[in-house]
Curated annotation (Swiss-Prot):
This is Small ribosomal subunit protein uS10. GO terms for molecular function: structural constituent of ribosome; tRNA binding. Signal peptide: none annotated. Part of the 30S ribosomal subunit. It comes from Thermotoga neapolitana (strain ATCC 49049 / DSM 4359 / NBRC 107923 / NS-E).
Length: 102
């Protein structure tokens, strides 16, 4: 597939798991002789939640929770059919969300 690229977006709460998965994908793509751009770290999505500690009163007593979503972007340029087959067979951990665009 000359002139094409595969864009892979990875998302996870755990950045170590995310980096491990990105490394696996890059190794698989390079082993099939494809050009790889990345992993490019994208901005971390940070969400704060403020919750009252007490079920009824004491509004001044609150608890804060934070959710961070780490993201990485990998581009595979001019992928061969071997590359696509290898990417389909790769096993990634359950905590990693993978979004692939052709």
């Amino acid at each position: 597939m000359p002139g094409q690229r595969i864009r892979i977006k990875l998302k996870a709460y755990d950045h170590e798991l995310l980096d491990e998965s990105a490394k696996k994908i890059v190794e698989v793509a390079k082993s099939t002789n494809s050009k790889v751009s990345g992993p490019i770290p994208l901005p971390t999505e940070r969400t704060l939640y403020c919750v009252l500690r007490s079920p009824m009163k004491h509004k001044d007593s609150r608890e804060h929770f934070e959710k961070r979503v780490h993201k990485r972007l990998i581009d595979i340029i001019d992928p061969s059919p071997k590359t696509i087959d290898a990417l389909m067979r790769i096993n990634l951990p359950a905590g990693v969300d993978v979004e692939i665009k052709l």
